[in-house]
Amino acid sequence: MASKRALVILAKGAEEMETVIPVDIMRRAGIKVTVAGLAGKDPVQCSRDVMICPDTSLEDAKKQGPYDVVVLPGGNLGAQNLSESPVVKEILKEQESRKGLIAAICAGPTALLAHEIGFGSKVTTHPGAKDKMMNGSHYSYSESRVEKDGLILTSRGPGTSFEFALAIVEALSGKEAADQVKAPLVLKD
Protein backbone atom coordinates (compact mmCIF):
# COMPACT_ATOMS: atom_id res chain seq x y z
CA MET A 1 0.00 0.00 0.00
CA ALA A 2 1.34 3.42 -0.92
CA SER A 3 2.13 5.64 2.00
CA LYS A 4 -0.35 8.35 2.90
CA ARG A 5 0.48 11.95 2.01
CA ALA A 6 -0.14 15.12 4.00
CA LEU A 7 0.11 18.78 3.07
CA VAL A 8 0.70 21.22 5.94
CA ILE A 9 0.23 24.83 4.83
CA LEU A 10 2.58 27.16 6.69
CA ALA A 11 1.66 30.85 6.73
CA LYS A 12 3.38 33.76 8.44
CA GLY A 13 2.02 33.95 11.99
CA ALA A 14 1.22 30.24 12.27
CA GLU A 15 1.29 28.78 15.78
CA GLU A 16 4.53 26.81 16.13
CA MET A 17 3.31 23.85 18.19
CA GLU A 18 0.24 23.42 15.98
CA THR A 19 2.58 23.17 12.99
CA VAL A 20 5.54 21.14 14.26
CA ILE A 21 3.73 18.60 16.46
CA PRO A 22 1.39 17.36 13.69
CA VAL A 23 4.30 17.24 11.21
CA ASP A 24 6.42 15.22 13.66
CA ILE A 25 3.62 12.83 14.68
CA MET A 26 2.53 12.18 11.09
CA ARG A 27 6.13 11.51 10.03
CA ARG A 28 6.56 9.09 12.95
CA ALA A 29 3.51 7.26 11.57
CA GLY A 30 5.12 6.93 8.15
CA ILE A 31 2.96 9.58 6.50
CA LYS A 32 4.82 11.54 3.82
CA VAL A 33 4.42 15.14 4.99
CA THR A 34 5.06 18.20 2.84
CA VAL A 35 5.34 21.50 4.71
CA ALA A 36 4.49 24.16 2.15
CA GLY A 37 5.20 27.84 2.64
CA LEU A 38 2.22 29.99 1.69
CA ALA A 39 4.51 32.80 0.52
CA GLY A 40 7.25 30.60 -0.95
CA LYS A 41 10.22 28.50 0.15
CA ASP A 42 11.81 31.01 2.54
CA PRO A 43 11.75 30.46 6.32
CA VAL A 44 8.43 31.49 7.88
CA GLN A 45 8.20 33.62 11.02
CA CYS A 46 5.63 32.05 13.31
CA SER A 47 3.48 33.58 16.05
CA ARG A 48 6.17 33.36 18.76
CA ASP A 49 9.02 34.40 16.44
CA VAL A 50 10.21 30.84 15.80
CA MET A 51 11.37 30.46 12.20
CA ILE A 52 10.27 27.29 10.38
CA CYS A 53 11.73 26.27 7.03
CA PRO A 54 9.12 24.85 4.65
CA ASP A 55 9.99 21.90 2.43
CA THR A 56 8.70 23.73 -0.62
CA SER A 57 6.39 26.52 -1.74
CA LEU A 58 2.63 26.03 -1.74
CA GLU A 59 2.59 26.61 -5.51
CA ASP A 60 5.04 23.72 -6.01
CA ALA A 61 3.31 21.50 -3.44
CA LYS A 62 -0.01 22.04 -5.20
CA LYS A 63 1.46 20.50 -8.36
CA GLN A 64 2.45 17.40 -6.35
CA GLY A 65 -1.10 16.73 -5.12
CA PRO A 66 -3.52 15.30 -4.38
CA TYR A 67 -2.92 14.70 -0.68
CA ASP A 68 -4.76 12.45 1.75
CA VAL A 69 -5.03 15.32 4.24
CA VAL A 70 -4.58 19.08 4.12
CA VAL A 71 -3.61 20.53 7.52
CA LEU A 72 -4.17 24.15 8.57
CA PRO A 73 -2.30 25.24 11.71
CA GLY A 74 -3.73 28.07 13.79
CA GLY A 75 -2.33 31.29 15.11
CA ASN A 76 -4.44 34.40 14.54
CA LEU A 77 -2.23 35.96 11.87
CA GLY A 78 -1.53 32.59 10.29
CA ALA A 79 -5.24 31.81 10.05
CA GLN A 80 -5.93 35.25 8.61
CA ASN A 81 -3.27 34.69 5.95
CA LEU A 82 -4.76 31.28 5.12
CA SER A 83 -8.22 32.86 4.95
CA GLU A 84 -7.09 35.52 2.47
CA SER A 85 -5.25 33.18 0.09
CA PRO A 86 -6.91 32.24 -3.22
CA VAL A 87 -4.45 29.33 -3.55
CA VAL A 88 -5.52 27.93 -0.16
CA LYS A 89 -9.15 28.28 -1.27
CA GLU A 90 -8.42 26.36 -4.46
CA ILE A 91 -6.61 23.57 -2.60
CA LEU A 92 -9.37 23.26 0.02
CA LYS A 93 -12.15 23.25 -2.59
CA GLU A 94 -10.33 20.52 -4.52
CA GLN A 95 -9.72 18.52 -1.33
CA GLU A 96 -13.38 18.81 -0.36
CA SER A 97 -14.63 17.87 -3.84
CA ARG A 98 -12.47 14.74 -3.92
CA LYS A 99 -13.60 13.82 -0.39
CA GLY A 100 -10.15 14.17 1.17
CA LEU A 101 -9.57 14.85 4.85
CA ILE A 102 -9.19 18.48 5.96
CA ALA A 103 -7.73 19.13 9.42
CA ALA A 104 -7.57 22.55 11.11
CA ILE A 105 -6.62 23.60 14.63
CA CYS A 106 -7.07 26.65 16.88
CA ALA A 107 -7.93 29.64 14.66
CA GLY A 108 -7.20 27.54 11.55
CA PRO A 109 -10.86 26.51 11.13
CA THR A 110 -11.74 30.15 10.42
CA ALA A 111 -10.05 29.61 7.04
CA LEU A 112 -12.66 26.91 6.38
CA LEU A 113 -15.35 29.50 7.01
CA ALA A 114 -13.63 32.09 4.81
CA HIS A 115 -13.40 29.60 1.93
CA GLU A 116 -16.86 28.05 2.52
CA ILE A 117 -15.55 24.57 3.31
CA GLY A 118 -17.40 21.90 5.28
CA PHE A 119 -20.61 23.85 5.82
CA GLY A 120 -22.96 21.86 8.03
CA SER A 121 -20.11 20.17 9.92
CA LYS A 122 -19.64 20.08 13.68
CA VAL A 123 -16.38 21.89 14.50
CA THR A 124 -14.31 23.16 17.38
CA THR A 125 -11.81 26.03 17.57
CA HIS A 126 -9.77 27.94 20.08
CA PRO A 127 -12.28 29.59 22.46
CA GLY A 128 -11.14 32.99 21.15
CA ALA A 129 -12.15 32.04 17.58
CA LYS A 130 -15.57 30.61 18.47
CA ASP A 131 -17.59 33.78 17.82
CA LYS A 132 -15.96 34.33 14.43
CA MET A 133 -16.50 30.69 13.47
CA MET A 134 -20.13 30.76 14.51
CA ASN A 135 -20.93 33.99 12.63
CA GLY A 136 -23.81 32.73 10.52
CA SER A 137 -25.25 29.26 10.83
CA HIS A 138 -22.70 27.39 8.73
CA TYR A 139 -21.42 25.04 11.46
CA SER A 140 -22.48 23.52 14.75
CA TYR A 141 -19.99 24.04 17.57
CA SER A 142 -18.40 21.50 19.86
CA GLU A 143 -16.40 22.10 23.04
CA SER A 144 -14.50 18.83 22.42
CA ARG A 145 -10.72 18.97 22.35
CA VAL A 146 -10.78 17.27 18.95
CA GLU A 147 -13.88 17.02 16.76
CA LYS A 148 -14.15 14.84 13.66
CA ASP A 149 -17.25 15.18 11.54
CA GLY A 150 -16.95 13.24 8.33
CA LEU A 151 -13.90 14.57 6.52
CA ILE A 152 -13.53 17.72 8.66
CA LEU A 153 -11.25 17.31 11.69
CA THR A 154 -10.79 20.29 14.03
CA SER A 155 -9.12 20.97 17.36
CA ARG A 156 -8.78 23.70 19.98
CA GLY A 157 -5.23 24.95 20.37
CA PRO A 158 -1.57 24.37 21.25
CA GLY A 159 -2.47 22.16 24.21
CA THR A 160 -4.46 19.80 21.98
CA SER A 161 -1.80 19.50 19.25
CA PHE A 162 -0.81 15.93 20.15
CA GLU A 163 -4.44 14.75 20.26
CA PHE A 164 -5.10 16.53 16.95
CA ALA A 165 -2.06 14.95 15.30
CA LEU A 166 -2.92 11.46 16.58
CA ALA A 167 -6.51 11.90 15.32
CA ILE A 168 -5.11 12.67 11.86
CA VAL A 169 -2.96 9.53 12.00
CA GLU A 170 -5.95 7.46 13.12
CA ALA A 171 -8.14 8.88 10.33
CA LEU A 172 -5.51 8.09 7.68
CA SER A 173 -3.84 4.94 8.96
CA GLY A 174 -6.08 3.47 11.66
CA LYS A 175 -6.19 3.30 15.45
CA GLU A 176 -3.40 0.73 15.69
CA ALA A 177 -1.00 3.06 13.85
CA ALA A 178 -1.98 5.97 16.10
CA ASP A 179 -1.53 3.83 19.22
CA GLN A 180 1.93 2.69 18.06
CA VAL A 181 3.03 6.31 17.62
CA LYS A 182 1.46 7.38 20.91
CA ALA A 183 2.98 4.67 23.14
CA PRO A 184 6.57 6.00 23.37
CA LEU A 185 5.52 9.66 23.67
CA VAL A 186 4.75 9.41 27.42
CA LEU A 187 1.57 11.45 27.00
CA LYS A 188 -0.77 11.85 29.92
CA ASP A 189 -3.98 9.85 29.45
UniProtKB/Swiss-Prot annotation:
What protein family is recorded? Belongs to the peptidase C56 family.
Lipid-modified sites (S-palmitoyl cysteine):
C46, C53, C106
Where is this chain primarily localised? membrane
> What enzyme category does the UniProt record give?
hydrolase
- The modified positions for Phosphotyrosine read Y67
User: What name does UniProt use for this protein?
Assistant: Parkinson disease protein 7 homolog
Q: Which UniProt keywords apply?
A: Acetylation, Autophagy, Cell membrane, Chaperone, Copper, Cytoplasm, Endoplasmic reticulum, Fertilization, Hydrolase, Inflammatory response, Isopeptide bond, Lipoprotein, Membrane, Mitochondrion, Nucleus, Oxidation, Palmitate, Phosphoprotein, Protease, RNA-binding, Stress response, Tumor suppressor, Ubl conjugation, Zymogen
Can you provide one Gene Ontology molecular function annotated for this UniProt record?
Answer: mercury ion binding
PTM section of the record: Sumoylated on Lys-130 by PIAS2 or PIAS4; which is essential for cell-growth promoting activity and transforming activity. Undergoes cleavage of a C-terminal peptide and subsequent activation of protease activity in response to oxidative stress.
Give the species this sequence originates from: Mesocricetus auratus
Question: What SUPFAM superfamilies does the database record attribute to this sequence?
Answer: Class I glutamine amidotransferase-like
Transmembrane domains' residue ranges: none
The EC number(s) given in the record are 3.1.2.-, 3.5.1.-, 3.5.1.124
Localization in the cell: Cell membrane; Cytoplasm; Nucleus; Membrane raft
Listed under catalytic activity are:
N(omega)-(1-hydroxy-2-oxopropyl)-L-arginyl-[protein] + H2O = lactate + L-arginyl-[protein] + H(+); N(6)-(1-hydroxy-2-oxopropyl)-L-lysyl-[protein] + H2O = lactate + L-lysyl-[protein] + H(+); S-(1-hydroxy-2-oxopropyl)-L-cysteinyl-[protein] + H2O = lactate + L-cysteinyl-[protein] + H(+); N(omega)-(1-hydroxy-2-oxoethyl)-L-arginyl-[protein] + H2O = L-arginyl-[protein] + glycolate + H(+)
Disulfides per UniProt = none
Active-site residues, as the UniProt record annotates them: C106 (nucleophile), H126
Note how many cofactor molecules are bound and how: Deglycase activity does not require glutathione as a cofactor, however, glycated glutathione constitutes a PARK7 substrate.
Tissue localization of expression: Detected in liver, heart, spleen and testis (at protein level). Detected in liver, heart, spleen, kidney, epididymidis, vas deferens, sperm cells and testis.
List GO terms (cellular component aspect): cytoplasm; cytosol; endoplasmic reticulum; membrane raft; mitochondrion; nucleus; plasma membrane
Q: Which residues carry this modification: N6-succinyllysine?
A: K182
Name one matching Pfam family.
Answer: DJ-1_PfpI
